[in-house]
């Protein structure tokens, strides 16, 4: 009986050959993919926080408004309304604003507006009681108010005065809002953060803070009322690299503020709104493209004057929503938890 031996063209041989070719092609494609993919891992999702400092700002609503230096917490009605509306806008986009309040805000008789913000889920952090300078070298340089009324310090040494100013803000928040502060932001931003100021960091750790926001990176500015050219904008965007979270040697986490702040743009630069929005957009696009952390720093007491239609905040929400696969709105507590 003649047996049928498979020939080179038989189905069995063809299938074996095709299986071998398919396997080799798959292995080759995988190797090529790995080779091409080396070093091109997609960046992490960008984390975009909107932070608003609740204080009054020198030079707003008018350039000659300087009395706020002595009453930083005496918020006017416009500032309160802007804060409430901004919180609603961001919540509608699925985000939260991280507020930082100076303690003197809690001396005002009616803070129902701030309670409503807290009840809507927006965190509020400690911004010291009197908007003091934590890097001051002597006690009289802590704040304008103490230069005018030094007896308020009761002869305290520098670091005791700093500790008390932070501590009584914690107490005020507990008493008036029933909450603990959601982190700490220094009044003013420093190009080196608190790297050279271990004592204030130690005070903050002692008071229970495990993250702070104190660094604002150096970047180019324009002359007053001068439109920022491409070189200035590129310099501001480049400064984002210096505004990423890091830890100090003592373990304290720093979450820097991102450029450009509203005070830098509108007080120092005296920019118009469109220049500011264009620069903000460039910073956000870089943040989203590279998966960076972005901490939008602004003050309702400034924004209600220069941006009454909330264009900056709406721009942030719009870009985060449009690029939802690459970016998300968040707050500094969540950034800290992921750092």
Where are these predicted regions, by residue range?
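N-terminal secretory signal peptides and thylakoid transit peptides that target proteins
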Residues: 3, 8-31
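Bacterial Sec-dependent signal peptides at the C-terminal "C-region" and cleavage site
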Residues: 31-43
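Active-site beta->alpha N-cap acidic-glycine motif
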Residues: 43-123, 131-133, 180, 185-190, ...
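Acidic-and-aromatic substrate-binding clefts and catalytic sites of carbohydrate-active enzymes
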Residues: 75-80, 100-110, 132-137, 159-162, ...
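CE4/NodB-like, metal-dependent polysaccharide N-deacetylase domain
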Residues: 84-96, 147-192, 209, 255, ...
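C-terminal domain-boundary segment and adjacent tail
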Residues: 93, 211-216, 274-339
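Substrate-binding cleft of extracellular glycoside hydrolase catalytic domains
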Residues: 120-166
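Active-site-adjacent pocket scaffolds in enzyme catalytic domains
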Residues: 143-151, 186-287
């Amino acid at each position: 009986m003649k047996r049928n031996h498979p020939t080179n063209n038989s189905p069995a041989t063809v299938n074996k050959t095709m299986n071998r070719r398919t396997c080799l092609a798959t292995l080759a494609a995988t190797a090529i993919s790995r080779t091409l993919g080396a070093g091109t891992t997609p960046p992490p999702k960008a984390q975009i926080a909107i932070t608003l400092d609740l204080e009054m700002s020198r030079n707003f609503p008018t350039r000659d408004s300087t009395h706020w230096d002595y009453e930083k917490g005496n918020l006017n009605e416009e500032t309160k309304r802007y804060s409430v509306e901004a919180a609603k806008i961001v919540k509608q986009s699925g985000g939260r604003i991280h507020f930082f309040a100076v303690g003197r805000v809690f001396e005002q008789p009616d803070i129902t507006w701030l309670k409503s913000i807290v009840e809507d889920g927006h965190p509020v952090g400690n911004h010291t009681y009197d908007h003091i300078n934590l890097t001051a070298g002597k006690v009289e340089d802590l704040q304008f108010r103490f230069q005018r009324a030094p007896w308020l310090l009761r002869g305290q040494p520098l670091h005791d005065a700093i500790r008390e100013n932070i501590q009584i803000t914690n107490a005020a928040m507990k008493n008036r809002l029933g909450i603990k502060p959601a982190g700490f932001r220094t009044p003013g931003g420093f190009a080196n953060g608190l790297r050279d100021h271990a004592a204030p960091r130690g005070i903050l750790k002692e008071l229970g803070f495990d993250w702070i926001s104190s660094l604002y990176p150096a970047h180019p500015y324009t002359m007053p009322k001068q439109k920022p050219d491409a070189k200035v904008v590129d310099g501001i965007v480049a400064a984002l690299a210096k505004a990423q979270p890091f830890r100090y040697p003592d373990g304290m986490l720093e979450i820097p503020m991102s450029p450009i702040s509203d005070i830098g743009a509108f007080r120092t630069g005296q920019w118009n709104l469109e220049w500011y929005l264009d620069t903000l957009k460039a910073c956000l696009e870089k943040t989203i493209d590279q998966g960076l952390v972005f901490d939008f720093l602004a003050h309702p007491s400034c924004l209600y004057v220069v941006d009454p239609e909330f264009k900056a905040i709406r721009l942030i929400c719009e870009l985060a929503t449009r690029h939802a696969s690459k970016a998300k709105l968040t707050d500094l507590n969540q950034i800290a938890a992921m750092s």
